[in-house]
C-alpha cells in the first residue's frame, strides 16, 4: 500500500482479530525517503488497548466513553517501532511482544445511526408483553444507548 507521502507499507505478519482479545495487529515494513523501518500497527477495543500502551492521554477514558454513550462504535489505534530483524525473526515475532509498550495514535469513531422506527418498534414490542433481548458484540454502553 502506498501513502500520500510516497511511503510504501507492506504487511509482514498479521495477528488475527480475536473476539476474546478484542484486538488485531500487524507487523508492517515501511519504506519511505528515510529508509526502511518496522512497526507494529494495532486496533482494538479502547478499554483493552489501554492496558498495552506505555501512556495514554489524560482524557482517554472520558473521550471514548463519551462517544460510546452516544451510540458510536469506537476503536483505539496504536503503534510501536520495532528493531530491524531478518524475515525468519519477523515471522516468528511473538504477539505478546508485538502488542506491548504501544504508543497511542488515536480513536476511530464510527456512527451507525438507528433506523428511524427502531425506538417505536422496541416500545411496541415491550408494550405487547414481549421480552426483548439484544445480542451484540458492541460495547455495553453502546447497546444501552439503543435501549
Where are these regions (language model features)?
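Cytosolic catalytic regions of ATP/NTP-dependent phosphoryl-transfer enzymes
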Residues: 1-104, 110, 119, 123-128, ...
